[in-house]
A protein has these predicted regions:
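Fe-S-dependent hydro-lyases/dehydratases of central metabolism
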Residues: 1-891
Length: 891
């Protein structure tokens, strides 16, 4: 009988006076064989399969295949994984709720039951992506930024509040509370989930998917989770399992301890560089080794957070005593902590000293070898030793701008009646921001200590630096104040600007007008230093060409120095009141000082700040909504529009159409990010999206950002490939979202060309290099291309989430054969493309791509289909994952 293994593994667990039913891996091992050395992360997957075994979506063969992974540390098998819950943020959450509302309209039109369009598992949406650093450097910055956020985003927030009452199991954490991953780490994450089923308590691992790539941060708490596109998350919350291949697992052994003066940020940048080099895309990474015995949970969370930057699906830290300590500190109940301890030990998921699981491959890092580091100027994996930053900046300046540093003279400017000179290499943004580091008390206390020492000696922030502090939760403000550091951070301009992502996602706000004018006038290459996780070109601010990731204390140090050309290991940061030079080593806090400061963090702070986490500010409470199951769409709205993805959809799918005569819309290089494809930041007035907003009566000051407009497909399709730093090789020497409408030669906006092709009924293609779609789990980077008419993307390789998103929107991802690239083929972008027999395409199959050159010559390239699983093929054949889900509901 197909359920035998599931039934045979059922057991009970007694924790104090409470009995839990659970699916026991040791009992299952009697049939599966010894699984002791299976990586802990795979044990979580194994339990998931065991619990959901139904003989259909999960079979006994699936369970055996995962257990037999141990034999070769690899398995070629698709499995159906069902996470316990879903996490969202508002930039990805708004379009997801738009999709759910549109799905209700489609189900209604096709005669189905709209009540079926409801989450079957808990969904938490944390509003954190909308606050922008408009005001900074004074005590009123926080309240003013919150006021502007509520004013700009009122319509979006009305919509989310409607969603909260319209959909079951859907909770919204209001704006001004914190960053979703930090709220997840400090409050939402349980490590072990329990719920009443048929009158019995059932315990199982806390697992999740999230609509943000940094969902991986929760793996620091021993919770398996990763980012998926919004469309995949919607399918998951509606009961559709996540289709995945059993992953390879790379072991990362940490030994030793960090040296004096080295931070968790230095460690994570080193780990990121090592893992990118090793190659972990599509794989799990699991950390082990005696180095974990002393690695605080906040440091683990910092490392887990940057999984997307090193390319892994997740970076998993098994549950151990340090996990339990953190859960107690952050206010979890003693009952919950005891359940986590008992369950993890019973299931063999507890980390014991000396554990050596079987891994597909492994790396080792002696933490004593880690040095002070930054990453930049435009990729998070490009770690640079602190001493080498001036050299790296200079190299990037000459490379990117084809001009030497000495050619650029400082530019005079006046601000607040004072005359200044803005140098090339100036740091114009210094931001303590992002869940990556603001969840970590040790680096934040280090920043506070450094600020205190600097102010005491009379050092000041350079006048051209826009400084900001945006913690991921209110607890941070509590402990910085308790330690007495807030006045010193304020003195240096690091006033609280909001609780949210801010600069890290491009919401850095405008630079002061005199600074912007000086940068443009001198064509200066300036820098941003932030404690974030992403530094792609054009992401932080349109005028800032180099972006550097650094620890919070180094962010403060660069605000004092004000220049990327200064070597902080030997050049002075400034001068004290006597005129003597002050060096970084003079004010860098000791490990003992940091440890003493961290003792100020208390459980009471977590209890206080999370007691009313779903309540919100008076402004949030005042938002009025119509209580209805379907949304009242406003035809004149520029924020929330009924999406067109289900227009004309029928109850049964049409056969997949072959691609004939497709034109190449863009030919792109390596490491094209989802930021390049669908930017989140500011909207240029002269762009197609800017022109659309102005034509609908929106003033420039009210444009807001692309990210905030993701509920309006009209803005987003116009913003597709609109990043100001994208380079389309079809128009050499031109930066920004431009192309040619073939066979003509005129350079036009990508959106305008796509619309012209649509009128001509010509399908479109995109050609790209390696790591296409890296970065954020941005479903609009697939939705936008779909609306432009793109049918196929042919690249050298794809990043995991984006590949999945393309399929989820009915776009075919194809991979060039090994060693074949657009360059080796000599492609110009003028080729026409034919791909036939798509009705019979198979996962991983070889697909002949017929290229017709502009001179009529023909060539066949044998590409690999990157539809990887049978389930993904079903989605593709249904024209997308949500179409498939709707048809399932109707049946």
């Amino acid at each position: 009988m197909s359920s035998t293994l599931r039934e045979a593994s059922m057991d009970t667990l007694q924790v104090k006076d409470k009995t839990y039913r659970y699916y026991s891996l040791p009992l299952a091992a009697k049939s599966l064989g010894d699984i002791t050395r299976l990586p802990k992360s795979l044990k979580v997957l194994l339990e998931n399969l065991l619990r959901w075994q139904d003989g259909n979506s999960v079979t006994e063969d699936d369970i055996h295949a995962l257990a037999h992974w141990l034999k070769t540390a690899h398995a070629d098998r698709e499995i159906a994984y069902r996470p316990a819950r879903v996490l969202m943020q508002d930039f990805t959450g708004v379009p997801a709720v738009v999709d759910l509302a549109a799905m209700r309209e489609a189900v209604k039109r096709l005669g189905g039951d709209t009540a079926k369009v409801n989450p079957l598992s808990p969904v938490d949406l944390v509003i954190d992506h909308s606050v922008t650093v408009d005001r900074f450097g004074d005590d009123d910055a926080f309240e003013e930024n919150v006021r502007l956020e509520m004013e700009r985003n009122h319509e979006r927030y009305v919509f989310l509040k409607w969603g909260q009452q319209a959909f079951s199991r859907f909770s919204v954490v209001p704006p001004g509370t914190g960053i979703c991953h930090q709220v997840n780490l400090e409050y939402l994450g349980k490590a072990v989930w329990s719920e009443l089923q048929d009158g019995e308590w059932v315990a199982y691992p806390d697992t999740l998917v999230g609509t943000d790539s940094h969902t991986t941060m929760i793996n620091g708490l021993g919770v398996l989770g990763w980012g998926v596109g919004g469309i995949e998350a919607e399918a998951a919350m509606l009961g559709q399992p996540v289709s995945m291949l059993i992953p390879d697992v790379v072991g990362f052994k940490l030994v030793g301890k960090l040296r004096e003066g080295i931070t968790a940020t230095d460690l994570v940048l080193t780990v990121t560089q090592m893992l990118r080099k090793h190659g972990v895309v599509g794989k799990f990474v699991e950390f082990y080794g005696d180095g974990l015995d002393t690695l605080p949970l906040a440091d683990r969370a910092t490392i887990a957070n940057m999984s997307p930057e090193y390319g892994a699906t997740c970076g998993f830290f098994p549950i151990d005593g340090i996990t339990l300590e953190y859960m107690r500190l952050s206010g979890r109940s003693e009952e919950q902590v005891e359940l986590v301890s008992a369950y993890a030990k019973a299931q063999g998921m507890w980390r014991n000293p000396g554990d050596e699981p079987v891994f597909t491959s492994s790396l080792e890092l002696d933490m004593g070898s880690v040095e002070a580091s930054l990453a930049g100027p435009k990729r998070p994996q490009d770690r640079v030793a602190l001493a080498d930053v001036p050299k790296a900046f200079s190299a990037s300046n000459e490379l990117e701008v084809n001009s030497s540093l000495k050619d650029r003279q400082p530019v005079d400017y006046t601000m607040s009646g004072q005359q200044y000179k803005l140098p090339d290499g100036a740091v114009v943004i210094a931001a303590i921001t992002s869940c990556t580091n603001t969840s970590n008390p040790s680096v934040l206390m280090a920043a506070g200590l450094l600020a205190k020492k600097a102010v005491t000696l009379g050092l000041k922030r350079q006048p051209w630096v826009k400084a900001s502090l945006a913690p991921g939760s209110k607890v941070v403000s509590d402990y910085l104040a308790q330690a007495g550091f807030t006045p010193y951070l304020d003195e240096l301009g690091f006033n609280l600007v909001g609780y949210g992502c801010t600069t890290c996602i491009g919401n850095s706000g405008p630079l002061p007008d005199p600074i912007e004018t000086a940068i443009k006038k001198g064509d200066l290459t300036v820098g941003a230093v932030l404690s974030g996780n992403r530094n792609f070109e054009g992401r932080i601010h349109p005028l800032v060409k180099t972006n550097w990731l650094a620890s919070p204390p180094l962010v403060v140090a660069y605000a004092l120095a004000g220049n990327m050309n200064i070597n902080l290991t030997k050049d002075p940061l400034g001068h004290d009141r006597k005129g003597d030079p002050v060096y970084l080593k003079d004010i860098w806090p000791t490990a003992q000082e940091i440890a003493r400061a961290v003792e100020q963090v208390s459980t009471a702070m977590f209890h206080k700040e999370y007691a009313e986490v779903f309540e919100g500010t008076p402004e949030w409470k005042a938002i009025q909504i119509d209580r209805a199951d379907t949304y009242g769409w406003q035809s004149d709205s520029t924020y929330i529009r009924l999406s067109p993805f289900f227009d004309g959809m029928q109850a049964t799918p049409d056969p997949v159409q072959d691609i004939h005569g497709a034109r190449i819309l863009a030919m792109l290089g390596d490491s094209v990010t989802t930021d390049h494809i669908s930017p989140a930041g500011s909207i240029k007035p002269d762009s197609p999206a800017g022109r659309y907003l102005q034509s609908h009566g929106v003033e420039r000051k009210d444009f807001n950002s692309y990210g905030s407009r993701r509920g309006n497909h009209e803005v987003m399709m116009r913003g597709t490939f609109a990043n100001i730093r994208i380079r389309n090789e079809m128009v050499p020497g031109v930066e920004g979202g431009m192309t040619r409408h073939l066979p003509g030669t005129e350079v036009v906006a990508i959106y305008d060309a796509a619309m012209q092709y649509q009128q001509e009924n010509i399908p479109l293609a995109v050609i790209a290099g390696k790591e296409y779609g890296s970065g954020s789990s941005r479903d609009w980077a697939a939705k936008g291309p779909r609306l432009l008419g793109i049918r196929v993307v042919i690249a050298e390789s794809f990043e995991r989430i984006h590949r999945s998103n393309l399929i989820g929107m009915g776009i075919l991802p194809l991979e060039f054969p090994q060693g074949v690239t657009r360059k080796t083929l000599g492609l110009t972008g003028e080729e026409a493309i034919d791909i036939t027999d798509l009705q019979n395409i198979k996962p991983g199959a070889t697909v002949p791509v017929n290229m017709v050159r502009s001179d009529g010559r023909k060539e066949v390239i044998l590409c690999r289909c990157r539809i990887d699983t049978a389930t993904e093929l079903t989605y593709y054949q249904n024209d997308g994952i949500l179409h498939y889900v709707i048809r399932n509901m109707l049946n």
